[in-house]
Amino acid sequence: MATYTKEKDVETALEDDAEARAAMQEVFSNTARWPAGFGGFTADATANINGVEHKGTVTVKGPKEIETDISDEKAKGFLTENLASIAMHRGPRSFEESDGKYKLHFGDDDTHPLGRKLIMGGDGMSSFYRIKDGRIQQINRQTPRFSFSINIEESRKNQDGKFLTHKYSVFYFNPETKGLKDVESYTDEYTRVGEADLPEKRRIINCEEGQIYVSTMTLSNHKLL
């Protein structure tokens, strides 16, 4: 995904909805995360950016603690950006540290194909989700540079019965004109190491200046730290 800085939380007059909070807490508990005290991992890594391949190793300790010995700047940036995103979403944290800190409120009924709209009151990115069957099916956020919508297409359960997202698409929009800027299609594979589901492969198909680009990140020989 395109990188962005999380906007500061804002004041909100929205009242917290107990039903929405309970639904979001269920979603949170259904999502696979690395175990508490997770120290990170190392792995052999291959970055293939539209046919140009670079190999090396990576060390992942957290979203802001990622190292690789690959010197090519484009491949290094590709690995770092995607591993940071995975570490952020899979990293251990409580509900109160994440979505639970906002005023949660339903924004419509339950007739949308992707589920009910759940508004995150107090979030500085005007975020709202759509949730259905105990899962987030859509994420919508706004930044000064672009707005985006993440649409979940397929999820799989790990050996603990928790969900890992397998396929999803991201639509980027111009915040002023609302015109479509870009589309990215993701496919993720995970491998179980100890009590953690670690990234094994990510494929991204996206359009850029009228051309289709395909990039893959492949990790192997994982070792826990």
Regions found by a protein language model. Give the residues of each.
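A broad, low-specificity signal for short, low-complexity segments enriched in glycine/proline
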Residues: 3-8, 17-21, 29, 77-80, ...
